[in-house]
Amino acid sequence: MASHEQSYKAGRAEGRAHEKGEQMKESMKEKAEAAKQKTMETAEAAKQKTMETAEAAKQKTRGAAETTNDKTKQTAGAARGKAEETKETSGGILQQAGEKVRNAAQGATDAVKHTFGMADADEDEHNYPATVTRKD
């Protein structure tokens, strides 16, 4: 009878061991599923954070580009205005210089005419009033 009882105890022990193995197997499955879920959540959070960071960088770059564009337009406008002002100023200076050269040339011409006696009496009187002698 001892062998029957031993067989019974061995069967019970085997059943408990099998049950314990199944419990451990189920527990491992649950833990693996939980780890898988946690990994997926972490990956999704990382993906979301990456997208947010990329969008923020994109917005910042867009803002910087707009600011640069605005500053470039302002600088170009100021340069355009300064160029117009310089053009007007230099045009006036060139005109004045041209008039001075023309007047100097006219004065030289009149002096040469007067020196060689080629000037009319009216020209002499107009250009050299103190030196003209009238014959009345």
Curated annotation (Swiss-Prot):
Task: Kindly state which keywords UniProt assigns to this record, in alphabetical order.
Answer: Repeat
Q: One GO cellular component from the entry?
A: nucleus
Compositionally biased, Basic and acidic residues: which spans? 11-58
Instruction: Give start and end residues of every LEA 11-mer repeat repeat.
Output: 31-41, 42-52, 53-63, 64-74, 75-85
Q: In its keyword annotation, does this UniProt entry include Repeat?
A: yes
The record's region (Disordered) falls at: 1-108, 117-136
UniProt xrefs under InterPro entries:
LEA1/2/D7/KIN2
- Biological role stated in the UniProt entry: LEA proteins are late embryonic proteins abundant in higher plant seed embryos. There are two subsets of LEA proteins (5a and 5b), the first ones are expressed when the cotyledon weight reach 80 mg and the second set are expressed above 100 mg. The function of those proteins is not known.
Family that this chain belongs to: Belongs to the LEA type 4 family.
The UniProt record's further free-text remark is:
This is a SET 5a protein.
By what name is this protein known?
Late embryogenesis abundant protein D-7
